[in-house]
Amino acid sequence: YCNEIRRLDYYVGEVVRELESQNALSNTVIIFLADNGRPFPRAKTRLIDDGMKTPLLMCGPGIEPKTSTKSLVSSIDIAPTILELAGLDKPKSFQGKSFAPILSNPNAKIRECAFSEHNWHDYQAYGRSVRKGEYLYIINKFPDKAWIGPEDSVSSPSHQQLRKAMLSGKELTPVQSDIFLCPRPGEELYDTSKADKLQIKNLANDPHYADVLNEMRKILKDWIDSTLDSVPENPTKDSFDHETGKRILEKNQFSDDYAGKKRRAEYLICPQ
């Protein structure tokens, strides 16, 4: 990862120098973003911050250098932002919101909530989440399975060493043991502030957070309904072993059922 950062810095510098040579730098917005694909335990495919919170760096005209923001944005907001910066209107079919106001005012807010989802990725899965302020709410429709991550995480030395330690009776930290938790809760609620930055303390059953839980439930349900989402009734089976990460080969392993198929979500042009 350190080498990737060094390479990024070098090649972005090359692009900047080329833009300068063409006298185009002052009229160019540079955007760097990354996916959530690091294959580490409790990262890739997880709907907590370590799985969903990704880098987003921008520079260009109207963007104050060396500033940062805590405002909530989603990846679907990038396209509307580019269009606004280019002076173009956003098509009605776009779900995202332009975060151009944040570029000139880091304290500006463009959205109250951001949503995430996890579907089949080497293993059966259906997870949905909503982030509002400091609260994160997650539902899991396959709680009988450990949320271990994809095959490249399960087969990694870090995951296998943790499994070896667990099986030998060594005490793991709550963060380490979480990847082996089975069954898992069907609902999770976290306060992502300094009190629980790693999302370890599930507040879903805490009566003090009942109002927050009900609010987050409704927000997520409304989003699921608006996007015509649904849980697959005949999901594709696991393609890899949960413990070893080795390939499983079976007949009729893959299903044509998927999230949203029951409600024909693929025909939805613009969620309301």
Protein language model features and the residues they cover:
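Active-site His/acidic residue clusters
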Residues: N36-I48, C59, A195-L198, D206-P207
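C-terminal cap/loop subdomain of S1 sulfatases and analogous C-terminal strand-loop tails that border
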Residues: A86-E188, D211, R263
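Substrate-binding rim/cap in mid-to-C-terminal beta-strand-loop elements of soluble/periplasmic
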Residues: G13-S21, A43-S93, K97-E112, K201
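Long, internal low-complexity/basic segments
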Residues: K53, K170-E187, K194-Q272
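Short glycine/proline- and acidic residue-enriched helix-loop micro-motifs
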Residues: Y1-C2
